[in-house]
């Protein structure tokens, strides 16, 4: 029988958002198709019926799949099928995960898997936001316990106006690109980048986005009313209050002494030792430590969980009531900062940023246009000239684990730090380099991603990259009392505050505004008022960090590292690209080989020349300019005859550029046959006598011969002072061969016999050629000699 299909629609930003269920994936616990424009995302959710034993976390996995057929593309590679998730897909999966995770019941240990599959992508409406809406709708319609639904929108700013769900092309001009997700009552997640927007403007954008989120939530509730399943019964595990009090009485003040220690290593060691002592005391029989309670005795896991709960309550209560943090700081106090730049001799730029026990080494490498990252995704094909990679090795936390590729966390942290610097990078016209930043976390105690932002800014300035302003980042925390409504905002949170607090709010920016932001929470949402207080406290912290950074380096270095490549950029006409490349790439390869450079040419005629030193790059520039410049009337060239036809000859005057020498312009006297005077391969002096609109060049040899004859006649007469003048030999460019012989072909030169006993021939002193005169030889090296023509 045909499926029963239910759908609800709402207009968002002038386009119809449709959520549909019942058509596909009927065996999933929840499945929806979300359409917006011509972008379609299928999101499914499946939950296990039984909890996973022996774990202390919620086993939620979120996958985001980009199918290349969605954009009408065939995947690359040998197998022509999708492989591992792209970086964009991983970021979209994390974006989907964060707003739905806080709404699962506390203590829920059943495995849940959410999969969003992009089925159609119109390259205008971004599918990542639809994935959040789809995950929420699928969970809402399923029987899995969940306290949703949530809605999500993207917000931008064009011409001073806030725009909901801007298209991909509008985002290119937008001052902000921020995704906001939340329930009907509160904000759950914020992530994005901006071009130095103020804190007030950011709050305004979030409030505007929340208005649309409420409408999206209402649509899901309407759909749930007609197509939702009854929720499974779930009873959260209850704490053993009596046992918990016994453990607290046993510990006394020793728990505070262990937890409140400014040194993370000592705190972890003391807390772990105390935890083992408590377990040994309350679970004396070792076999019972891993089994089910017998005779009223608890298990080791139960005692350990109660100990962890006491630690959490102690930290949160002390922060709320006394304003004291585990390391002794006040809520708005930043840890001690120590900075060093230029500590690595060979990399192009480096910075070591240390904040408390968090330490990050960031290294900057400058590359060429060809080293840009190609983004093969469902969207607009593009390349990326600025990259930031984040590495989190196990020794940074004193742990041991296998070294593998970057984790999802590594990719997410790297992307956040990357977005933070985009607003201050120089344009490609100003700085035509590819920039790769790598942040190595050497020691971790919270806020490593924001330390990477600071390190990136410092390393770029150390490398001489002309960023407009330095950027700093700080991570904010939150501790709330759900009963009284009291809350305390923490500046520069450390690891224990991140783990036991309610929020991780990362804010990066310059002195003038926010450039990147990311907010994750563990409660049911926060209000704009809390967010406003957190942003103001973050602004003060950011300015403090920027002051510390400016004490070490306050502006980009005037010179780049001597080990960095030198890149020059010139512009040629698109129709001249073929002249520079040459047949089969012969010309451009010759230039690169002779000058030691790398040359890349864009479709619009932009040419990038990179070399180990600037002199080599400028030699290549001069050669390209010779290839592409249009000769002017009156210029004299020393060219080679390449083709002879009855009406004249074609003479190569520049590499790949020929001019036509008509038979009447070969000599002053009448020439019956071109071959009587010229031979293919003969090198002659010619003058440009005309350039046609289509670029064709007319040459004359006769004009030069007549001029030489007139000069010889003038110099044959004795001057008034009685001295005689010797005839002056015609000057030729450096490296030219024997002078032209007229009228017949040049006499071939016999090769010299060389041997061990024959001394090397002395090098002749090269003469300086007259202005506008060039010789085209077999080797570009002769053209690019030490004595360049003026």
Swiss-Prot record:
An example Gene Ontology CC term for this record: cytosol
Main location: cytoplasm
PROSITE patterns referenced in this protein's UniProt entry, alphabetically: KH_TYPE_1, S1
Domain named S1 motif: residues: 634-702
Chain sites annotated for binding Mg(2+): 498, 504
Keywords noted in UniProt: Cytoplasm, Magnesium, Metal-binding, Nucleotidyltransferase, RNA-binding, Transferase
Name of one Pfam family that matches: S1
GO molecular function ontology, one term from the record: 3'-5'-RNA exonuclease activity
Segments for region (Disordered): 710-790
Comp. bias intervals (Pro residues): 757-772
SUPFAM superfamilies the record matches: Eukaryotic type KH-domain (KH-domain type I), Nucleic acid-binding proteins, Polynucleotide phosphorylase/guanosine pentaphosphate synthase (PNPase/GPSI), domain 3, Ribonuclease PH domain 2-like, Ribosomal protein S5 domain 2-like
EC number: 2.7.7.8
Basic and acidic residues bias locations: 739-755
Cofactor(s) it depends on: Mg(2+)
Alphabetized InterPro entries for the sequence: ExoRNase_PH_dom1, ExoRNase_PH_dom2, ExoRNase_PH_dom2_sf, KH_dom, KH_dom_type_1, KH_dom_type_1_sf, NA-bd_OB-fold, PNPase
GO process terms (BP): mRNA catabolic process; RNA processing
Reactions that this protein is recorded to catalyse: RNA(n+1) + phosphate = RNA(n) + a ribonucleoside 5'-diphosphate
Enzyme class: transferase
Segments forming domain KH: 565-624
Compartments (UniProt record): Cytoplasm
Family that this chain belongs to: Belongs to the polyribonucleotide nucleotidyltransferase family.
Stored NCBIfam families: polynuc_phos, PRK11824.1
Protein task: Involved in mRNA degradation. Catalyzes the phosphorolysis of single-stranded polyribonucleotides processively in the 3'- to 5'-direction.
Protein name: Polyribonucleotide nucleotidyltransferase
Organism whose genome encodes this protein: Thermomicrobium roseum (strain ATCC 27502 / DSM 5159 / P-2)
């Amino acid at each position: 029988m045909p499926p029963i299909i239910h759908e609800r629609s709402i207009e968002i930003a002038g386009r119809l958002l449709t959520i549909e269920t019942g058509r596909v994936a009927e065996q999933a616990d929840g499945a929806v198709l979300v359409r917006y424009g011509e972008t379609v995302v299928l999101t499914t959710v499946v939950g296990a019926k039984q909890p996973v034993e022996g774990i202390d976390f919620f086993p939620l996995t979120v996958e985001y799949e980009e199918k290349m057929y969605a954009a009408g593309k065939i995947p690359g590679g040998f197998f022509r099928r999708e492989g591992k998730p792209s970086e964009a897909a991983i970021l979209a999966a994390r974006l989907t995960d964060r707003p739905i995770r806080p709404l699962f019941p506390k203590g829920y240990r059943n495995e849940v898997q959410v999969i969003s599959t992009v089925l159609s992508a119109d390259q205008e409406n971004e599918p990542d936001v639809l994935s959040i809406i789809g995950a929420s709708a699928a969970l809402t319609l399923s029987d899995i316990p969940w306290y949703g639904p949530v809605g999500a929108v993207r917000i931008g700013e064009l011409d001073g106006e806030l725009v909901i769900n801007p298209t991909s092309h509008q985002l290119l001009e937008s001052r902000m690109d921020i995704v906001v997700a939340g329930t009907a009552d509160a904000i759950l997640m914020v992530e994005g980048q901006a071009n130095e927007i103020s804190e007030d403007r950011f709050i305004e954008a979030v409030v505007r986005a929340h208005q649309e989120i409420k409408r999206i939530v209402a649509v899901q509730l309407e759909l749930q009313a007609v197509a939702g399943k009854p929720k499974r019964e779930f009873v959260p595990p209850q704490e053993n209050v009596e046992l918990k009090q016994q453990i607290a009485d046993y510990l006394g003040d020793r728990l505070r002494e262990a937890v409140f220690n400014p040194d993370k290593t000592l705190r972890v060691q003391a807390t772990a030792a105390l935890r083992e002592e408590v377990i040994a005391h309350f679970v004396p029989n070792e076999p019972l430590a891993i089994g089910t309670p017998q005779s009223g005795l608890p298990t080791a896991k139960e005692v350990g969980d109660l100990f962890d709960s006491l630690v959490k309550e102690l930290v949160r209560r002390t922060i709320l009531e006394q304003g004291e943090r585990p390391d002794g700081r006040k809520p708005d106090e930043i840890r001690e900062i120590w900075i060093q730049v230029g500590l690595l001799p060979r990399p192009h730029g480096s910075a070591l940023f240390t904040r408390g026990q968090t330490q990050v080494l960031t290294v900057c490498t400058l590359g060429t246009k060809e080293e840009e990252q190609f983004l093969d995704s469902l969207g607009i094909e593009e390349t990326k000239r600025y990259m930031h990679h984040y590495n989190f090795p196990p020794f940074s936390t004193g742990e041991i684990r296998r070294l593998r590729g970057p984790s999802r966390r590594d990719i997410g942290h790297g992307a956040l730090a990357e977005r933070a610097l985009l607003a201050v990078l120089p344009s490609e016209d100003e700085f035509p380099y590819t920039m790769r930043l790598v942040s190595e976390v050497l020691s971790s105690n919270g806020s490593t991603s924001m330390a990477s932002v600071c390190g990136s800014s410092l390393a770029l300035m150390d490398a001489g990259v002309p960023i407009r302003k330095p950027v700093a980042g700080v991570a904010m925390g939150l501790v709330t009392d759900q009963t009284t409504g009291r809350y305390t905002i923490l500046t520069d949170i450390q690891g224990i505050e991140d783990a036991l607090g309610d929020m991780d709010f990362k804010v990066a920016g310059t002195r003038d505004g926010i450039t990147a932001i990311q907010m994750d929470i563990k409660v049911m949402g926060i209000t704009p008022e809390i967010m406003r207080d957190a942003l103001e406290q973050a602004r003060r912290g950011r300015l403090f960090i920027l002051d510390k950074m400016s004490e070490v380096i306050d502006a980009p270095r005037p010179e780049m590292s001597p080990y960095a490549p030198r890149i020059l950029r010139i512009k040629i006409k698109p129709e001249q690209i073929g002249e520079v490349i040459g047949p089969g790439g012969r010309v451009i390869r010759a230039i690169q080989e002779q000058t030691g450079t790398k040359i890349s040419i864009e479709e619009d005629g932009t040419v990038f020349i990179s070399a180990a030193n600037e002199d080599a790059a400028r030699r290549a520039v001069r050669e390209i300019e010779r290839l592409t410049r249009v000769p002017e009337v009156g210029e004299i060239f020393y060219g080679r005859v390449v083709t002879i036809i009855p009406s004249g000859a074609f003479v190569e005057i520049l590499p790949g550029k020929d001019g036509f020498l008509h038979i009447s312009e070969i000599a002053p006297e009448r020439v019956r046959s071109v071959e009587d005077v010229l031979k293919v391969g003969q090198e002659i002096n010619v003058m440009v006598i005309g350039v046609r609109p289509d670029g064709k060049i007319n040459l004359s040899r006769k004009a030069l011969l007549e001029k030489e004859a007139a000069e010889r006649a003038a110099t044959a007469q004795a001057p008034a002072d009685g001295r005689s003048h010797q005839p002056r030999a015609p000057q030729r460019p450096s490296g030219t061969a024997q002078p032209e012989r007229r009228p017949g072909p040049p006499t071939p030169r016999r090769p010299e016999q060389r041997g061990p006993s024959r001394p090397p021939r002395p090098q002749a002193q090269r003469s300086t050629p007259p202005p506008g005169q060039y010789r085209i030889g077999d080797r570009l090296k002769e053209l690019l000699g030490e004595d360049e023509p003026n």
